[in-house]
């Protein structure tokens, strides 16, 4: 059986984790293997990279962390993604599983090329090389005004979340631009709706994607 590859994208606080878990439960209720993962941090190597990306580099001074240059940040994301595909995503797809990832290469394009203002073509080429061109069959972009989504956060801000309102707004615009360029892959959902309404839209769309792949009928 062919596997199904699904990604969830959006700025922080839009409710990706909640919907990922809903989709996991739905897939498993149909008797199909479901692998849920995330970027960065989907592998042991990724966990180490995630710590650097989200919290900076430990300098030995508890009051100071060395920041990461934008190009270095992009390379770290690509390294995490390459290992993630080789170790987790591709083997699961080859087994016929549904793979759901909380963030994938579109986050690099939105955060580095949009938020960090690096060159989009360079970021995309790097990500496609790292993944050997592997793209999700469907990407659910949960869209919300960053000011609204930021208010939902219930934990201390990490490095990305603390980057400022302008950064978050540029990132949201970059996500929407990506969706406009690839409408056959992206499904944009207004994340300011209720959890149930968001889930209903995801479920209805996922059923069409999975049926096309020979999965849930």
Curated annotation (Swiss-Prot):
Q: What is its EC number?
A: 2.7.4.9
Please give one Gene Ontology molecular function term for this protein.
Answer: dTMP kinase activity
Is the keyword tRNA-binding in the record?
no
Annotated Gene Ontology cellular component terms = cytosol
> InterPro entries attached here?
P-loop_NTPase, Thymidylate_kin-like_dom, Thymidylate_kin_CS, Thymidylate_kinase
Enumerate the Pfam families for this protein.
Answer: Thymidylate_kin (PF02223)
Where ATP binds, per the record, is at: 10-17
A biological-process GO annotation: dTDP biosynthetic process
- Quick check: keyword ATP-binding in the entry? yes
The record's keywords, sorted A to Z, are:
ATP-binding, Kinase, Nucleotide biosynthesis, Nucleotide-binding, Transferase
Q: By its UniProt entry, which NCBIfam families does this protein fall under?
A: DTMP_kinase
Q: Which family does it belong to?
A: Belongs to the thymidylate kinase family.
Q: Could you identify this protein by its name?
A: Thymidylate kinase
As recorded in Swiss-Prot or TrEMBL, the protein's gene is named tmk
């Amino acid at each position: 059986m062919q596997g199904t590859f699904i990604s969830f994208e959006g700025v922080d606080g839009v409710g990706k984790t909640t919907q990922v878990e809903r989709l996991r439960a739905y897939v498993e209720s149909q008797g199909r293997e479901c692998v849920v993962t995330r970027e960065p941090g989907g592998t042991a190597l990724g966990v180490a990279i995630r710590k650097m990306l989200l919290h900076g580099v430990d300098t030995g001074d508890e009051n100071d962390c060395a920041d990461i240059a934008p190009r270095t940040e992009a390379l770290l994301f690509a390294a995490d993604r390459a290992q993630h595909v080789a170790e987790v995503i591709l083997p699961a797809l080859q087994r016929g599983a549904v793979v759901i990832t909380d963030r994938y290469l579109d986050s690099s394009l939105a955060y580095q090329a949009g938020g960090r203002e690096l060159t989009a073509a360079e970021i995309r080429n790097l990500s496609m090389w790292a993944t050997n061109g592997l793209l999700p069959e469907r990407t659910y972009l949960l869209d919300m005004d960053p000011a609204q989504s930021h208010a939902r956060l219930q934990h201390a801000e990490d490095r990305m979340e603390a980057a400022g309102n302008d950064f978050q707004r540029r990132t949201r615009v970059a996500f929407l631009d990506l969706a406009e360029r690839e409408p056959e892959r992206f499904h944009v959902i207004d994340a300011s709706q209720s959890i149930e309404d968001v889930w209903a839209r995801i479920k209805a769309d996922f059923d069409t994607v999975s049926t096309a792949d020979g999965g849930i009928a």
